[in-house]
Amino acid sequence: MAKQEGWLRCKPLVYRPHPGRRHAAAAMTVLYMASALVVPDSGVSAWLVLAADAAVLDRLAEWFIGQPAFKTEVAMLALGNAFAGAGFLVLGATRLGLDLPPVAGPHMLSVGALGCAVMAVLIIAGLRHTGRDLLDLRWQAHGAALLMAAAAFVRVLPEIAFASGLAPLLWSLPTGR
């Protein structure tokens, strides 16, 4: 348990997933990946990816609540999990025949889930490895997290023919290139 100080005074941060479901998301994801490799065109992999979606969203339902959920690094981790759930849902629906772009699910998983999770880890590790507290988060980190989240949202929109030129701009702004 970590205790928050400063402008965000609240109860100790506690995240306790239900013991029986602690590894369900990872297990269902591994089962889906194995079935997608062995029987890629089978309906089994479609149903397993939907089971992985349910497990990821179940884990997200037990996320931090209250004021700690509004901290940038916690919100980015939650958004990454939300993108993972949405990506698995779209991937499963596409495999079951729903008329969705086939790249929308993988883009939600890669750009959304992975991008937001990596940004959160960079924020946390960057502060911890330089000996600073998480309350010492500068405006640049908040801005980079916001741009990463916006880029993840905008990356999926071109699949539905909207805002196709905005994604590269938002992806380049956090790095300054």
Spell out what each predicted region is.
Residues M1-R177:
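Hydrophobic alpha-helical transmembrane segments of multi-pass integral membrane proteins
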